[in-house]
Amino acid sequence: MAALITSTTAATAASGPLVDYLWMLILGFIIAFVLAFSVGANDVANSFGTAVGSGVVTLKQACILASIFETVGSVLLGAKVSETIRKGLIDVEMYNSTQGLLMAGSVSAMFGSAVWQLVASFLKLPISGTHCIVGATIGFSLVAKGQEGVKWSELIKIVMSWFVSPLLSGIMSGILFFLVRAFILHKADPVPNGLRALPVFYACTVGINLFSIMYTGAPLLGFDKLPLWGTILISVGCAVFCALIVWFFVCPRMKRKIEREIKCSPSESPLMEKKNSLKEDHEETKLSVSDIENRNPVSEVGPATVPLQAVVEERTVSFKLGDLEEAPERERLPSVDLKEETSIDSTVNGAVQLPNGNLVQFSQAVSNQINSSGHYQYHTVHKDSGLYKELLHKLHLAKVGDCMGDSGDKPLRRNNSYTSYTMAICGMPLDSFRAKEGEQKGEEVEKLTWPNADSKKRIRMDSYTSYCNAVSDLHSASEIDMSVKAEMGLGDRKGSNGSLEEWYDQDKPEVSLLFQFLQILTACFGSFAHGGNDVSNAIGPLVALYLVYDTGDVSSKVATPIWLLLYGGVGICIGLWVWGRRVIQTMGKDLTPITPSSGFSIELASALTVVIASNIGLPISTTHCKVGSVVSVGWLRSKKAVDWRLFRNIFMAWFVTVPISGVISAAIMAIFRYVILRM
């Protein structure tokens, strides 16, 4: 009993003088919340930026998921405050007799880190919250105790991580995406290989992320008592179990879903429909031709119509912005959608009978081009077929307009012409064809004629003419009208010449279905781990401040209070909702276009890099890993798809993060020491 009384008295005596610093504790809580806000506005983009960029989730959905997993992760995993940040960079034992100076240093470090992260968020530059707090900690220590208080060897490791993190993560992401593209994306039918690889992908995702979470040794979950072999065994066991579940239950369901999506509604068929076999196409063609003959007998067409001599197999078009997929040789034929009740004449001057009775006749020049190259596909399109709505949806997915909510993006205007929009969204010039109207024995005839090279006159065309124009590759991307590019938001991309190349290698609908949930799962795991890791950056100095005030001991080993972690988690979530979209736009849209397959490669390889680097002992930055992966995968898809000027700005922001946050922290610490505390 006497010993207990003695220890209690000693603790009270130690903390007694610190009561005068209550104002500093309150100020520290306020600044810590601002710091957590800035972490949410900047660092959370690491977890869901690529998912939003690929269109897998909207910004609102990302904020909801991130709020849940960041908060849970901060409470469950954040109890193990990073020793590198709190004690590894400076010698805290030097502040045994000057606890007030250490408290002032904690406030200064939080202020310097928060200010620079807010500035970076305003500039839409993703930076490392870890390196911010590192620079700020070094800054106040230099003012308080000089160079003797800094462990420069730890700083050298951090400088190395600037280059190791993006390089290592970029290499891993590049290798993974190369394998995915070679064995899945570039296959004529990517579904079989994709379904075979699905259990492996899920197993790797679950195994790597579970190991990362358990390896942190969270006390609340009891992971700190697990040996390394136990962590590995549990991770591998869960991964194998997940693979079996996916193989026996998820894959069959996914296969049925893909088949159902392929047999899509008529409104989607102009873009996404894919027939199962040529035999089915032939049967449907026969049926459609018989219907046409019953409804529009050849004799009724008139002298201008040549009897139906050949029927071309049906093939609908799946195209990308500014890009046409290479069709197999057997499909490089003029084709029409006979389901739309259209007949085709196989004579030299081919003519197509429209459902409304109109006859569209191709001129000699167009027919010669078709016959010589076999590259142009012509389809009938009705204005009520839903194409306009489908194209609008496709554009929004490609530009991430519905996910970003960027008010600066100007929506395309229809301009009273259905197909001006059709052609603009396909990335085609508006003057590729001219429409000439005339009368031919009581029948309306439209002629498609080859344009003169110097003709730039805009004309209004009906849906059929413009859709033919859209799917025909008549001009190179460099000849696209600048106004169309401006409306599509492509004309401003200084970092990539030939901006249409940024849309290359877009995932097919069935491939997107395979990778969508994988990317969401990986992002949720990443957000959970991020909440536990980065809450240390926001709350670590506050924990030190609070424990010094509460116990009077600068090297206190008291467990971190849960309510402090929850406080930081709430601040992170508010920062994400209020200002998170700015950096998310940079990570998911501006740096390079993201697809579900590339986004999954980025997420998984980044998580693997963090696990490896953590075992090595590097204070690795998740931000640097994600940016390195995004740039690496974007460069593999197309060198011109990466905005290298933006990447240069991001790298420069990394380079100045430690000095700027350190200078701000040092300035505040100087005010505390020489003006306020006079110590």
Curated annotation (Swiss-Prot):
Entry keyword annotation includes Phosphoprotein: yes
Classification via PANTHER family: PHOSPHATE TRANSPORTER, SODIUM-DEPENDENT PHOSPHATE TRANSPORTER 1
Compartment(s) where it occurs, according to its Swiss-Prot or TrEMBL record: Cell membrane
Annotated InterPro entries: Phos_transporter
Chain's role: Sodium-phosphate symporter which preferentially transports the monovalent form of phosphate with a stoichiometry of two sodium ions per phosphate ion. May play a role in extracellular matrix and cartilage calcification as well as in vascular calcification. Essential for cell proliferation but this function is independent of its phosphate transporter activity.
Gene that specifies this protein: SLC20A1
Official protein name in the record: Sodium-dependent phosphate transporter 1
Reaction(s) catalysed (UniProt annotation): 2 Na(+)(out) + phosphate(out) = 2 Na(+)(in) + phosphate(in)
